[in-house]
Regions:
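An N-cap/entry alpha-helix motif that binds or orients negatively charged groups
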Residues: 2-49, 113-118, 122-123
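Glycine/Thr-rich beta-alpha phosphate-binding loop at enzyme active sites
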Residues: 27, 31-34, 38-42, 178-192, ...
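Glycine-rich beta-to-alpha transition loops that act as phosphate-gripper elements at the mouths
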Residues: 64-67, 141-144, 215-221, 291-302
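Catalytic cores of alpha/beta
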Residues: 69-76, 219-233, 284, 298-315
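Glycine-rich phosphate-binding active-site loops on the catalytic face of alpha/beta enzymes
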Residues: 82-94, 180, 237-248, 297-298, ...
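A gly/proline- and charged-residue-enriched helix-loop-helix capping module
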Residues: 87-137
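C-terminal helical cap(s) of enzyme catalytic domains, especially alpha/beta-barrels
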Residues: 93-109, 249-264, 320-345
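Active-site glycine- and acidic-residue-rich loops that bind
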Residues: 146-159, 187, 213-232
Length: 357
């Protein structure tokens, strides 16, 4: 009923608004979820997931980008997530790229954004989170400040400054964003620069926070190999595979409209195959102790199941919420639970029989 209400009433109203205005409106009213008796949740024993030593009630998390500044950490459990990731957080507060910078592609269940890492800055976010009550295990995504003069050694210093601000917070993990396409200098994709950052981070990581590296689905084979090798040298917990893509291949949206929108990272349903391929490749290269959080094009329980079978331990989504609303995560978890049970029956029927007797 609520799902139908969202798709027939709420979504059409939001889609008449500028995408960024709609996003801000949702943020304005989201804190009211704390006072609502409604929880959009589905629980099942076979959904419990271990991520870096934490037991999650389910493997479906909120991707970075929705709660950039940590304003909603006490209500995100109401949407049925097993964990959440806030950010990206940068050392300095920035306004991001000029508007318009967020665009819907309804024919593709996709979004193009070139927000440019707008946010309150690390100090403000850290102060807010120090006083906050986390409703879910919560990770934090760190990115380089989007300013043209922050490059090279300054980029390393910038990222470490953010880590210094947040390293004492009760976080589930920290992710380093090596894959944002909407900033000056693009991504932190130089091997030596990434190596320097990870080495210094682990020196400062006295609390032993699990460290993940967020990778682009557009990464070359060499970059994928470099990142995995660096992660192993410095004891990284794992990888987030992946982020938005610069590719526009296979879209249903009119090509003239896509060209009119211009640059930006594409997220949503068209990203799935690229994210799956990245997940499979990293799964081949990583250490058995390292874990993958998959991100990109996940909108159904079947999608989630495919990523888990590709080597992911947990999953993230964001764009699908825009199109399917607050009941989405519960539906994904319900479908995923059924698929996992069916697989167990198919592969281990004797175990099922013994547990049922």
């Amino acid at each position: 009923m609520i799902e139908g209400m969202y798709e027939k009433l709420v979504r059409p109203a939001l889609f008449k608004m500028d995408p960024e205005q709609a996003h801000n409106l949702v943020h304005k009213f989201a804190p009211l979820l704390a006072y609502s008796p409604i929880r959009f949740q589905f629980t099942a024993a076979n959904l419990q997931t271990n991520l870096s030593g934490l037991v999650l009630k389910n493997p479906v998390g909120l991707a970075a980008g929705f709660d950039k500044n940590g304003n909603l950490v006490k209500v995100l459990d109401r949407l049925g997530f097993g964990f959440a990731e806030i950010g990206s957080v940068c050392a300095e507060a920035t306004s991001g790229n000029p508007r318009p910078r967020l665009f819907r592609l309804p024919s593709d269940n996709a979004v193009i954004n070139r927000l440019g890492l707008n946010g309150d800055g690390a100090e403000a976010v850290a102060q807010r989170l120090a006083k906050a009550k986390f409703a879910l295990p919560t990770g934090l995504n760190i990115a380089k400040t989007n300013l043209p003069d922050i490059q090279g050694d300054k980029a390393v210093e910038d990222v470490l400054k953010t880590f210094d601000q947040i390293k004492s917070l009760p976080l589930a993990y920290v992710a380093f964003n090596a894959s944002c396409p909407n900033t000056h200098e693009g991504i932190l994709n130089e091997r030596q620069q990434l190596n320097d950052i990870m080495a210094e981070v682990q020196k400062k990581n006295v609390a032993g926070l699990p460290i993940f590296i967020k990778m682009s689905p557009d990464s070359t084979e060499q970059l994928i190999t470099d990142i995995v090798e660096i992660s192993q040298v410095h004891g990284m917990a794992g990888f987030i595979c992946g982020n938005t893509t610069l590719s526009r291949d296979g879209l249903n949206t009119d090509s003239a409209r896509v060209a009119q929108i211009g640059m930006g990272g594409l997220s949503g349903q068209p990203l799935k195959s690229k994210a799956l391929n990245l997940c499979r490749r990293v799964a081949q290269l990583k250490l058995p102790t390292q874990q993958i959080i998959a991100c990109g094009g996940i909108a159904t329980g079947r999608d989630a199941f495919e990523f888990l079978r590709a080597g992911a331990a947990a999953l993230q989504l964001y764009t699908a919420l825009v199109y399917h609303g607050p009941t989405l995560v519960a539906r994904i978890n319900q479908e995923l639970s059924v698929l996992l049970q069916q697989e167990l029956v198919r592969t281990e029927p004797q175990l099922i029989s013994e547990n049922s007797s």
